[in-house]
Amino acid sequence: MEQNLSKTPIKWRASAIVLAICLVLMVVTSVIGHNIQTSGGTVRTEELTFTTDVGATSHAKLYISETATAETPAPAILLCHGYTASLDAMESNAIELSRRGYVVMALDMYGHGESTLPPDGYKQAEMGNVENYAPDLGSYSALQQFKNYDFIDLTKIGMLGHSMGTAAIQEGAYLAYSKWQAAYTAAYAEALAAGSDETTAAYTAYGAAMNSGIVLPGSMVLTGYNYNVRNINDLTYNGVTAENGVFPLYAAPINICTIQGTYDEFSGLLWGVEDSSQYTTSFKFAYGTGGATNVPSGTYFMYGDASATPLTREEAVTAAASAAVTMKPIRAAYSFNGTHSDTYYDETAIGYGIDFFDITLRGGVATIAPTEQVWHGRAACGLIGLIATLVAFVALALTLLRVPFFSTIVRPAAPSISTVHGAKGVIGYIIPYIIFLLPAPLLYYWLIGYPYYMQPQWFKFLTKFMPNSFFNMAPMNSLMLFNGVVGGVFLVLYLLVFFLIGRKKGANLETTGLKLPFTQILKSLLLAVLSFAGIYAVVYACSALSGTNFSFFKFNIMPMDSTHWVAFFKYLPVWLLFFLLCGVIYNSLTRINNAPAWLNYLLCAVVSCGGLAMMFAYDYGKLFATGVRGIQYIPGTTSPEWLAAVGMSFPTALAGIMLFGLLFILPITAVMSRVLHKKAGSVWLGGFLTAFIVLVFTISHMVISI
């Protein structure tokens, strides 16, 4: 039987020791992570902000190798992350490239991280002067920042993007070459007007364009995204087919490599090929390569060679080096065993990118073999630091609960509704338990939709709660809708169980864990705020001192800027209500009075996300078995009526990726809720604190949509 620890003195020394260990781990992982990030001090990092061509404030991070000097300038590479991420997501690439001597700039895209959205009314001439349209997301202006550093070789510039970032770098490169072409055209016309013949005018114009100060990329790595193929009729991305497409960079001498996971969830949407392992059969691939199709992974070939005749490494090096003269750049195609997001943390994918840059920017010289990678240590530090942070929130709350002012919160916990005896009791418990598992998976994809909304790109996909000036984060709006609807269903189910079953067992308000004097509720709130703020202050300090964050894959708790803090408080009420309700369910219904503590922890963890986990297992299990996900499209978007009205079905890919984070944080906070209920005797402290934690976990890296 689980012991009611709220009746015994709080073991504050144990919680204080755990707190101390967590704080030490947070500091140590930050120090070690910084050492790995800077390659033992041979790479220095700098933060920079700049105003872009459309008036936004962009934030970036430079990684500068000690070998990059004015006397020996180094090649430079711009890294651009995907949607709902920040420049930290590109850290593994930044570490590996910078330790090989490249100067690296990792950029926060518009509305992500510490970069703002452009002010209303901006235009880009190269994009048709369409108001409020800047699809490069700041990548063009970031590219131009390279000319401010004398330790960068401006003839050897690369760009690497992931997903949305891949779309953005293609737009940024297009802007750069369009501006170069405009400078050339103006100088050519001026030379002709001055009496030069066409040959002399062309020579003069070329020199003028090259001296115009426009930084041009010569090498690009596209990961998790297609070639940006436009409709040749209106140069938009609407209605692109195999018959009407054009690749805007077809005339630019840029060597380009594509790297695609064989299980990429977005393949159908982006490439038009459901099985991502077959992405080179896409018409978009053919447009981007000048006609090649069905190209084996690892093949280097010339742009325009429809047969994709393989080049040796030496031939690829020679062709890449002369691309600006011959106007015949190379192409390369790679696949790796992974999903869309795995590109951030996959040795093979990272190695392919390194090797391509070595071939196209360094004449094939590899200072360190592409397979020799050390970013794993930094990733491990991020994960350990993140887990230590999560535990520290609770450890500090339990430690402060010993303080006389807060100790008045503590009271004996009321028994749960659930007591299990015999087979009948087991069945009586299992039935409602299973019922509570069902709403989340049944409603998840339908409620979350495809919450991609990037105002500068004009991409506004299906979401039932579009962002607005108040709730301005599309993914957070979808999660808020999910919390509200599923929370409402949970409330109805709980009330039915409470009044139909619980009341017969003597359940009352005290059973719910909500009965607490108002002053003690306020104290619980204050304790949760102090615990959250105290540990979050350490997160800020560790980030400021080390230049690293507690992040791993899709799991993040990182410092927030003022814009994110404002959003935090706007979304907070819904999170508070949802996690207070969850606390009531975990501790007054899921908890079994006569079960051991470990079993109750497990039951709470499973009920928090078990239904979602089973849906996830089916969805991704089928993906790994067949190459196509089990649940491909959002319910309701595949009917003939929908297709006739909208023209396309919407994939569940983005919602599926968002699910990774939920499956990580929900069971952890369910256990937190159970621990804090055992110690305090009510659900208030746990409800408040877990709401803060889950919200900062989801919002600290979230995109500002408008």
Name each model-derived stretch.
Residues I431-I706:
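Alpha-helical transmembrane segments of integral membrane proteins
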Residues E372-L386:
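Juxtamembrane/start-of-transmembrane alpha-helix segments at the extracytoplasmic/lumenal side
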